[in-house]
UniProtKB/Swiss-Prot annotation:
Keywords: ATP-binding, DNA-binding, Metal-binding, Nucleotide-binding, Repressor, Transcription, Transcription regulation, Zinc, Zinc-finger. This is Transcriptional repressor NrdR. A zinc finger (unnamed) spans 3-34. One of its GO terms (biological process) is negative regulation of DNA-templated transcription. The keyword ATP-binding applies. Belongs to the NrdR family. It comes from Bordetella petrii (strain ATCC BAA-461 / DSM 12804 / CCUG 43448).
Amino acid sequence: MKCPFCGNADTQVVDSRVSEEGDTIRRRRRCLSCDKRFTTYERIELAMPSVVKRNGSRSDYDTAKLRASLSLALRKRPVSTDQVDSVVARIEETLLASGQREVSTERIGELVMAELKKLDKVGYVRFASVYKNFEDIGEFVDAIREMQGPMLPGKLRK
């Protein structure tokens, strides 16, 4: 590892610790030339699949886009940033576990809707309205009915 102070390539690892989450290693290093210490972090670099858009074009997977879509759907809802981060992590784990080199935007949308359905019903309907390109109020009503599931005979929905 190259020293950030003098540029020398000879450094020594003084201490290594695994993060609480277990996904990062923090290393304290000492430069053998200038004797200054610095910290580096090491983590696994996972290769996310490429995204195939509806028009057939391909782009790199972008976590920021997923997070922005979720944040927009959940705007002014009682959902914490940690909850959004957990949803993003679960979706990314699912994509990685699939082992596919490519994933369609439709598949990502389905995963987002499944997570939002469990997390926040209003966020689900907001996301669905954009994702499914709702054009009238009937489509909103259909999405709400679908989300609520089948109605039992004699039972009224609240």
